[in-house]
């Protein structure tokens, strides 16, 4: 069993499938209060798949995952991946390649869709044509899925939506595995309110890719809390496409328009934060715990946490890319004809720079960084 996966905390949702015979009758499971909060927040978010989840804390569980294919026959899985825009994405891809390996009894058809919706639809149609056994999709955007999902269903191929969410009715896919990005946005804003303790915030937001549920969720969650703070002002919010180059470009243009007017930069992933830091450095703007500008980031990848440990990023909200083991567990249950969870949330936490203590986040240490493999 994969060690990393053992450390995942899952919230398993009740969400019974409308499809006869699909879904689990098990109680939802959670290990921490934070995980229960995650579920409750998801239930508030209309655009998200976990809206079906029921917040009920119960038994403890860890992700029993990456156990390998026990059916005795090779299982052919297609994975339509978003692209390779970020360190998070690279880690997610590697995790799928490790879990769905030939040694584990799988044949993985992996397509890097390079953030192109049309390419992603084409990839899924290719999987249908090849009559693969299971299709996994990390959807670039929330919209536009109904037709192709209907095609997969007509072909009798089970579909698992992973990482991000879609707008389609949940009768059109079989399971969903991912993180609650709205809750990540709420955590970031709650931490900021705690840190500022009533002081003014003039905020610039570097959003992720347009139309991605990770962008929509983080924005919605952050804005919901921001709306309760009359002392906060969001000066501007632009997409940096989840890339370092995008983050740098947006930050350079923000500096031109708002130099001297902002004290908070929210980057919706670590790579954007790296680009934003480069742009601020070049403009002699100081940031981090000893600087003039507070930086908030998302993902908490190894390098992002290194910057957090160094005090350059004040707060980094985790998003766990290690999800393939959970997807494999669902596929193994489907193959065995057993019950499985229709919706599985992979839990996230948040980290803050040394010297900061928070009710919403863990203070970074060398040990935490040493334990972060991706
Ligand atoms: O935060 C970002 C990636 O969908 C949660 O996509 C994922 C996001 C992640 O490119 O780095």
Regions found by a protein language model. Give the residues of each.
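Flexible loop/hinge segments that line or gate small-molecule binding clefts
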Residues: 145-183, 202, 208, 301-307
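Bacterial lipoprotein signal-peptidase II cleavage site
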Residues: 18-33
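Extracytoplasmic "Venus flytrap"
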Residues: 75-103, 108-126, 130-132, 138-142, ...
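Short, solvent-exposed amphipathic alpha-helices that sit
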Residues: 88-102, 106, 184-191, 213-232, ...
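Hinge/cleft segment of the Venus flytrap/periplasmic-binding protein
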Residues: 64-66, 73-75, 206, 210-214, ...
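Short beta-strand elements at the ligand-binding edges of bilobed clamshell
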Residues: 110-112, 168-191, 205-206, 237, ...
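Hydrophobic alpha-helical segments within soluble ligand-binding/sensing domains
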Residues: 70-73, 77, 120, 176-202, ...
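Hydrophobic alpha-helical
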Residues: 128-129, 133, 137-154, 222, ...
């Amino acid at each position: 069993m994969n060690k990393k996966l053992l450390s995942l905390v899952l919230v398993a949702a009740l969400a019974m499938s409308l499809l006869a015979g699909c879904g689990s009758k098990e109680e939802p499971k959670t290990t921490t209060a934070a995980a229960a909060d995650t579920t409750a927040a998801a239930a508030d978010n209309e655009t998200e798949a976990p809206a079906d989840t029921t917040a009920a804390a119960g038994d403890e569980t860890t992700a029993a995952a990456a156990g390998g294919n026990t059916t005795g026959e090779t299982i052919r899985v297609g994975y339509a991946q978003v692209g390779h825009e970020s360190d998070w994405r690279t880690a997610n891809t590697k995790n799928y390649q490790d879990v769905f390996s030939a040694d584990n009894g799988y044949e993985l058809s992996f397509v890097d869709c390079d953030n192109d919706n049309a390419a992603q639809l084409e990839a899924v149609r290719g999987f249908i044509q090849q009559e693969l056994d299971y299709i996994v999709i990390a959807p670039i955007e929330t919209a536009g899925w109904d037709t192709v999902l209907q095609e997969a269903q007509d072909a009798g191929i089970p579909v698992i939506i992973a990482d991000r969410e879609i707008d389609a009715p949940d009768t059109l896919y079989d399971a969903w595995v991912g993180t609650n990005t709205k809750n990540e946005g709420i955590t970031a804003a709650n931490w900021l309110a705690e840190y500022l303790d009533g002081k003014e915030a003039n905020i610039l937001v570097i959003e992720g890719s347009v139309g991605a549920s990770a962008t929509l969720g983080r924005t919605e969650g952050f804005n919901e809390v921001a709306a309760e703070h009359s002392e906060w002002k969001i000066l501007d919010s632009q997409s940096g496409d989840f890339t370092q180059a995008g983050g740098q470009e947006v930050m350079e243009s923000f500096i031109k328009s708002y130099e001297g007017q902002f004290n908070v930069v929210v980057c919706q992933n670590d790579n954007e934060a790296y680009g934003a830091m480069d742009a601020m450095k070049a403009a002699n703007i100081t940031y981090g715990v000893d600087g003039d500008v507070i930086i908030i980031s998302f993902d908490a990848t190894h390098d992002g946490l290194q910057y957090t440990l160094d005090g350059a990023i004040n707060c980094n909200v985790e998003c766990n890319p290690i999800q393939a083991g959970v997807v494999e567990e669902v596929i193994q249950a489907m193959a065995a004809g057993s019950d499985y969870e229709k919706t599985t949330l992979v839990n996230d936490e948040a980290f803050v720079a040394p010297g900061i203590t928070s009710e919403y986040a863990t203070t970074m240490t060398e040990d935490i960084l040493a334990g972060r493999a991706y």
